[in-house]
A protein has these predicted regions:
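Long, well-ordered alpha/beta core segments of mature domains
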Residues: 1-160
Length: 160
């Protein structure tokens, strides 16, 4: 039996982490869109989509700046450059005219270090969160572009 996600980008089925992240963020987008529709029933689909997209991007950026980036660059640099999110209130620093693109040099060289953060082995876990043991391990090389394991196991994996 062949099971697959049908994402907008074929790379989404490349490995379990990507499948999980794409699924989580797609579901969050849809959850936000439903909430916006409930509170704004006159909004058209395009507006619902774009507003939900804007909110989910902000959520993603908050996680990046609050949890991931401090681990990568360290808290000293985060503090030095004022990169930590506010603990209360809001910032007026957002500029919709700011160009958020990444340079080709950064995208093709410097940021590729992130590939070294991808684990080579995943352990299956039970619905309770308990590991299934060594027989329940999956090697990245065996599941590359094979989303079946994710679909069959409903995303129950633990990175080693």
């Amino acid at each position: 039996m062949f099971l697959s996600n049908i994402p907008g980008d074929v790379r989404a089925n490349e490995q379990l982490n990507l499948i999980a992240m794409h699924t989580i963020w797609m579901r969050e987008h849809n959850r936000v869109a439903r909430s916006l529709l409930f509170n704004n029933p006159a909004w058209l689909d395009d507006r619902l989509y774009e507003e939900a997209r804007r909110i989910v991007i902000a959520e993603y950026q908050h996680i990046i700046f609050n949890e991931w980036l401090p681990l990568i660059v360290g808290t000293d640099l985060m503090q030095k450059f004022g990169l930590f999110p506010l603990t209360s209130g809001h910032s007026d620093l957002y500029l919709d005219t700011f160009d958020p693109r990444v340079s080709n040099e950064f995208a093709t060289a410097a940021f590729r270090f992130g590939h070294s953060l991808i684990p080579s082995t995943f352990s299956k876990i039970a619905g309770t969160g308990a590991r299934s043991g060594s027989s329940g391990s999956l090697n990245m090389k065996d599941i590359f572009f094979k989303p079946r394991e994710f679909m069959v196991n409903k995303g129950n994996f633990f990175q080693k």
